[in-house]
């Protein structure tokens, strides 16, 4: 009896088992063919289902017969597919999901990539093993951000230095960060900086920006604060043309009766000023010394277009292009001073500054999908960024202001033009279900010029309207030409191999092996022409009409002579410029293993080995003979990331890594750069720092577009590099490894939440966001170490420890938005945002002088966007509504001394766009 019953049960189980089949497949974006990770796949009308893996694959066992599967993924239109399954057989399928709002009148139209959306980026953040932070074009639009520097400053723990595109990540400045475009490095446009000025990148080119604050083996190791990777826009939808126009104004600028701009400069920001021929034998300078005036109302024009072409069943060509031009006017008035330890001033000047800037950007992206498994993409980016400044200083300067003078007047006219050209070629190849190959190559060229900067220094005589040129030093009156050219080639290649198939036919692990190469060549040259004024003719000078003095007739009559640092017209090779050349090469191999250890615990273990060579050669007024300095470094850089899924909505993350920080070319070349209030000189004895990084993060995702997170982080830096004042008669600013160690520790908090929702059918809600960073930074300052390790400098720090330069103890960003949509395609969005920065160290004090500290301030901005139809919309921005005073103080031992103060003014802009 028992044997019969057992036989019956076995027979029934065989029948039941034989009635099941298997469906295997991949879920992907209909346009980009990118896999959709963690999408839902279920049998319609049941609770039976699975999620796709990291690569969009799924395996689902179903009863035999006709089954309807439902596929859903946030940001995409759900899809149903009927499939006939036979017992004991496997059916393989590929499902393309279409982005929401791109299916019109039954015609399927390709969509733009979903990574521009806030919700999609949050989902990727939630499901990735690595710690990720993104800001997409949707969020940038909501907050009215127009450039990449302002964009990243909206993220947790990131601050932007006022007046520049320099970024501080977790209190660490330019030298500790890195920038890239589509995963490939970018050259710097500033000889003093490691990273490119992110102000020059319009958000028109951006799909999203990734900010990596933890290190991964695929990245270059010159990293401690963060890596900022700009992902350029691609087009994968219906053809379109979008045209936008805008106008802008600065309240300080429009109040000026005469807004002073430089003479003989291009309105569009393109200049071709060269050093004149026979510059020492005659006065042959092209540009006038006198200023012009312009109406201080800015304007902008941009055009975006895209189209896709399909060939057969699998191949497609996707094109996207954008071109834009914009200009801005700024004006500020304030004070700028140089103080001593005894609280007296060596310079005490009032500043009146006029600035006119332009930006021209063009980008072309072409992506060719060869088939579902292979694609190649080409990116071309061109940026021309110009800035002209007319700075007028009036007050006291020690050794220049005479006893018979009321004050000293200094006029500095600076024109700067930067041109960036980026060429990138990238490829993605799915060789089989387990093996992918990805590669990229880039050739970047940057030209940064300061053609014909002019400076004139005069004294206003007492009881008179007359002025005289300062003749304290030849360089008090000069014209300066600077030219930087940098070429960079970079290449990446990496293979991903999935392994460890589980019982659900999904892969638990991924092995990545790759190689990176980077070679950067810089040529920098500078020539300064100084004017030696003849005392006999140095009287009754009109500071507003200096062309009356500086002209060929007066030169011929001996009113002044012209020299370079090498000498005058009779000196051999006097026109040879000061130069420094830099070459950087990096070869790197890396390996990374990502593995799902349990249902809840995943890990990523990486290792990278780099060989670095940096070679700097210079010939300057400090070293008339060509001098070379080279160092090499081998770096082994391990990294570890762990993710524990507490439940579907909560993650715990942990990361450890080791990195390094290189000194920059100009910091190691003995080149002097003179500004009105400071002189900088390089130090060839600089060497690299080593960095150790740790992060612990908790994150909670209440909904797909909401997040609450907290991160504790720590960084230990061995032999940190700082900008310091050397112990010299001229108090030059230079660079040194100032101590044995420094550290940064802090807490980051982020909240993004839907506060109120008034309509279930159409969007009608209030959302809020808050991110804050609380930091403590410390570094040991060691005079003996600096004096021992450096041949060309000595120093005496006022304090034996300090915080990191540029590090605020508190960074805060908050915003609240109201969003409403109507059924007739009308849409309203209004956002009020606030950013606050606490006090931060600007530079270290020496010789009993106090540290220079930038005082706390905050910005309040408002953005209003309204779409009248699906084709026509407007945007209004109001920035810096509170207009606080931007102040810098020198914290001397007896009192704080104000050394800089000004207000930026409020900025307003209004723009309209139409899509055809």
What function would you assign to each model-found segment?
Residues 28, 32, 40-44, 72-76, ...:
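Short, acidic, small-residue-rich periplasmic hinge/interaction motif at the N-terminus
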Residues 47-57:
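Short, acidic Ser/Thr/Gly-rich low-complexity loop/linker segments typical of extracellular
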Residues 114-115, 119, 123-168, 183-217, ...:
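Periplasmic N-terminal accessory/gating domains of Gram-negative outer-membrane beta-barrel systems
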Residues 286-392, 421, 638-640:
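Transmembrane beta-barrel wall of Gram-negative outer-membrane proteins
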Residues 405-426, 574-587, 660-717, 727-755, ...:
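Outer-membrane beta-barrel signature, preferentially recognizing the C-terminal barrel domain
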Residues 712-716, 735-840:
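Gram-negative outer-membrane beta-barrel transporters
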Residues 836-843, 865-916:
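C-terminal beta-signal and adjacent terminal beta-strands/loops
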